[in-house]
């Protein structure tokens, strides 16, 4: 009888101990779990950083756009130059390229930085991914409320004053629009490229994704819609322009880029 009394608890404790020792992937979060980054291998290999939108309502974290060097009209270009501009009481949790740019690394779409409009909303037709309509804008107000809005819808909101962006970056195409994959994406598409994008998701988090292998637009959009549960998601860029800084998972791309989006944390 003594054996029957003590065997189950001991085995349960052993199983719990073994379970606790098992690796949980490459997920690493800060102490408050406001953000985390990890590397995933399904449905394809990708790196993702999650940000709890509620964290932006406090004073410890801020989502920002960066473009030019301080007191200069020269673009920052790299994560290293951005890091050098941050004050000693702040650190860059993670960052990625924020959208498409011209030959001078200036944004080609609507851009607002700290309430100042850098580039007006671009509703013109054209070629390339940016003009694969509908495209959209990731934007947030001074209160840290983040949205991804289709460009024509945002145009109407700007006219009425409903939208008052403190930061904004326009890119395209939209990946997911109101829970629907972009209508021009082909499930059998054969154009495979490295891609990065961002989604505002139903669990209250933002998902910043950088594919670590070439994928189609449809595959990339499906990740946001089906796995990450993002009703709205926006393509930022791809190929050689796709860049990620996430030191918690040993990611630090050295590429040149235009506008950068990043999460800044105040040091305790």
Residue ranges, per PLM feature:
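Positively charged n-region of N-terminal signal peptides that target proteins for export
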Residues: 1-4
